[in-house]
Amino acid sequence: MYSSRKGLFVVIEGIDGSGKTTIAKKLVEKLKSMGYKAEYTYEPFASPFSQALKQYIDTYGGAEPEIETLAMALDRLYHIRKVVLPLLNEGFIVISDRYLYSSIAYQGARGIDLDWIYLVNRYAIEPDVAIYLRVPFDIALERKKQKESKWSYFEDIDRLKKAQDIYEKLVLLNKLVPVDASRKVDDVINECLNIIFDYLGKRKH
């Protein structure tokens, strides 16, 4: 039984409309039904830092890319220390809807140097499994129209396209494992589970 082992940190990445939230939540449901301790979490988290950024954006009509990057890094550190690490220490499989690679993609899309983004996130722990939900841009846009977002500020079309390009570069660098998310949800879930279980199998040896 997995509960006797150290936890597993899995992140689900992709542009808005790729199905991250749906897949992440369904993965947790599926893992729980199989007897694993699993928990869903997300970024930006509901930390004082993300709330401050939201207020800043509301007040000034936007945020400088450097301020945005630093606020997200603070939010991430809070998320790791207060949520992710405690769950991992209790042996949970933690499924995070977005993580560090969202900063690389979305703040990188605003022209921030990627090395600097990595630098200010140097205390962000390495995920065990990082999955990228790959979906054609037009399908993502169509899906995005069907739901309301708390962070629509990040979702203008030009920025999303640039973010998608950066995600694809991260795949080439072997930072992310790509999964075709244009298929039926069950097919996507099954492939993600196979990736997770493949990692668990290797870790046992």
Segment roles from a protein language model:
Residues R98, S103-D165:
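A glycine- and Lys/Arg-enriched "phosphate-lid" helix/loop adjacent to the NTP-binding pocket
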Residues I15:
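P-loop (Walker A) phosphate-binding loop of NTP-binding proteins
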